[in-house]
Amino acid sequence: MKEGIKCIFSRKIEGKIKTCTISRNPAGEYYVSINVETESSYPEPPAIKPETAVGIDAGVKNLAILSDGKKFPASDKFRKSERHLAHLQRILSRRTKGGKNWEKARVKVARAHNRILNQRNDLINNVVADIIKKGYETICVENLSIKDGMLQDKKHGKHNKQKRSRNKLIVDAAMGMLRIKLQQKCKSKGINFIKIERYFPSSKTCHCCGKIFKGLQLSQRSWVCPSCCAKLDRDVNAAINIKNIGISNSSLGRCTPEVKSVEHRKQKRRNAKSSDVSDVMKQK
């Protein structure tokens, strides 16, 4: 320790070092987390303009779909790593817990998990970097929840292969990780980041005339609007609607944590009024 520890730094350290934490993951790898204090501040985001804004729809087959038609396909390179992980887990299950061979197998399993995590992080970082490089001043996304996208089948439970397969694809897509990393990058670059409420029917609403097609099925990747006869790509149409609703509801002209739809706000006010009336009746 007197001679120091050799480290590989991901980037140059700027600012005054406050704390330094050394950690070790289950795979036996050591990391150093350095907390620094700097005088620099984040740039102020510009005013929101429709011509410099983009909407992003997250998906399973395509990780991100932009309102300008650009699609970032989800990678299937996890499959080979996951098959290798399953092989190592079978070996670990045959070892006696606490023994030397069990410990060796456990480390191999941990390294396989770490490899899959690194592959997923690399994919997300590349997608975020490509989006930021396009020079958008405003980015609108849907505040999705993984639980809302999961298929629930109480009748068949865990034995529904179709449900498990789709839920696995949703987890692999890492929609939450993409949104978090994109928001962090927007903050550091001075880009407006707008989240719209998750229950807005972005896929079922025609961006040309505003007609909502309630009969749209999940398997339909393209559809024709019954009102204006416009031919729509499901994902691109959703991204355009996300952009439009994000810009129209953002009256402040700055980045907002989450933009609620007009109907959502009206329902919230109605619920508040009904609760006030019930309180008055109780007092009487």
Please annotate each region the language model reported.
Residues G4-C7, P46:
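Short aromatic-glycine motifs in intrinsically disordered, low-complexity regions
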